Amino acid sequence: KVIGINSQIITQNGGNAGIGFAVPVNTAKAIVPTLIKGEKFLYPWIGISGMNLSKNHKKALELEENMDGVMIVDVMIGGPAEKSELKGYQETISDNYNSYPSGGDIILSINEIPISSMNELSSVLFENHSSGETISLSILRDLEKIKVDLELEPRPQ
């Protein structure tokens, strides 16, 4: 069973033993057909930077402990998220030990697929969606769940 494709090896003596880097097979499956056609693969992009919600961050925001999502930290100017009026964090809150971003939208799901981390958000976009496609985001804004449509764009180079 193929799990990845070797792409590079770091070695001290020029041999094939050392630290290897591989492209995951799901990534290759998504990209290779486009490349075979002689086309450039356009990664779908929503135009945010975000952060995972830790247990303490959720507590500081007064969210349920079992609620997962990605807090939008920053919205890229002119990007899809800005066009869809998504909001990055506005202020910080403290739990007497740490400060946490607050006031930003929290992405809960993409087309009903739950999102619990930035890594998962990237994977869901990459494996299931294309640039130019419109997706439906479930967002938590000011403790209220709302739906926001967003048209994916190609990730800037």
Residue map of PLM features:
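C-terminal recognition in membrane/secretory proteostasis and scaffolding
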Residues: 14, 27-157
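Active-site loop architecture of trypsin-fold serine endopeptidases
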Residues: 1-36
